[in-house]
Amino acid sequence: MRLILCVSLFVVLGCSSTIQPSKTIKKEEIVFNTISKGTLFGNGIEGILEEKFTIKNEKQWQVFLNKINSVNSVSSSFSEININFSNHIIICVFDTIRNTGCYAIEIERVFVEKKNLNVVYKKKEPGPMEMVTTIITQPYHIVKIEKRGEDHKFINKN
């Protein structure tokens, strides 16, 4: 019995693992501040399609503000308007124009991986039994992060 136990122990301890240790890719989470999250009600007149983009300078920001305010004064509800673009960039996600309410879009996470800035967002739609308003809407989410020099990629979590 001892012989079987010793042989079994020798076999188990003597075997080397063929599993290679995986290289872990370091992900750096980026803190973001929401500038605004809500819905446009301009029936697309603002000229903002279903888009995901970044704003990296004051000129782009002013063009964007003029666009988003073309129907309603949307930027009046922004948490901040004066952005220091030498230190920050703006990330925007806009859903498609919808025929009803109860839709939403949200940036959930921003992280850097392999020198790429990754923006993870999620869309929400009404359930099959949920009562919705009959109004044309376009959900959006706008956030500010510290300036990063990396390329950016948008990832739809749905």
Stretches found by the model and what they are:
Residues 4-13:
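Sec-dependent N-terminal signal peptides
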Residues 15-158:
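Exposed, flexible binding/inhibitory loops of compact, secreted disulfide-stabilized domains
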